[in-house]
């Protein structure tokens, strides 16, 4: 309905309170050429009703997907919405990302993932776990066929950290966090001693290729990088 569309667009434009962060939609708007983005799957939401999920509003199932242009070249983009259940991976969330890969492989165009994700959506249990596997499988299928770019803006936790490493090129904002397990999971460690989730550590470990000072610089570097792709 018109009301649902309005709520989805408004929610996708929300920012996390007290944080100087762009919203999921604002990141896409800054990345692609003006007025070039076509959203796909805007009305899709979560299917699960377990653990009171039926009471939660999850517009777009926590991810904005579609395609647009960067300097006239087609790119497929997904941007996770941290204002919607933390941008966590659920069944339909994963299906939307996989659909981007299918469309991108058919078109021979890059996939750009703008990551801001709390990890697995626990309420969806094995359906969410299967979503991770589906995303990994699509990335492996796309490897060598199309460029895959990941950009870590906020949190990239749990299984999605594997997805960023499977990409061909990974960008990371200086204040972002990338981890499978918390740094505190290491015996005797704490973040002040060695923040294994931080950009400095991840760049030294060659997990990420480019570290940027802020979101604006990160987006500008992706745009510049895409201009070099054939």
Give names to the regions the model predicted:
Residues 2-149, 155, 160-162, 166-178, ...:
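Terminal-region recognition feature
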């Amino acid at each position: 309905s018109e009301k649902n569309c309005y709520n989805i667009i408004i929610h996708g434009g929300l920012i996390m309170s007290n944080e100087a962060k762009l919203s999921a939609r604002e990141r896409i708007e800054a990345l692609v050429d003006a007025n070039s983005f076509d959203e796909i799957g805007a009305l899709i939401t979560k299917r699960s009703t377990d653990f009171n999920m039926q009471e939660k509003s999850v517009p777009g199932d926590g991810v904005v997907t579609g395609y647009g242009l960067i300097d006239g070249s087609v790119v497929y983009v997904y941007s996770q919405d941290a204002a919607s259940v933390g941008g966590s991976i659920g069944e339909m969330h994963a299906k939307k990302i996989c659909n981007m890969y299918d469309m991108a492989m058919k078109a021979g165009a890059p996939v750009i993932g703008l990551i801001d994700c709390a990890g697995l959506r626990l309420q969806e249990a094995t359906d969410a776990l299967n979503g991770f596997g589906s995303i990994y499988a699509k990335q492996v299928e796309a490897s060598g066929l199309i460029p895959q770019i990941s950009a870590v803006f906020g949190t990239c936790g749990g299984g999605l950290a594997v997805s960023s490493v499977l990409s061909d090129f990974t960008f990371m904002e200086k204040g972002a966090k990338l981890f499978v397990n918390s740094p505190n999971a290491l015996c005797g460690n704490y973040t002040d001693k060695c923040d294994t989730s931080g950009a400095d550590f991840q760049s030294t470990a060659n997990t990420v290729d480019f570290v940027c000072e802020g979101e604006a610089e990160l987006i500008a570097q992706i745009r510049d990088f895409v201009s070099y792709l054939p």
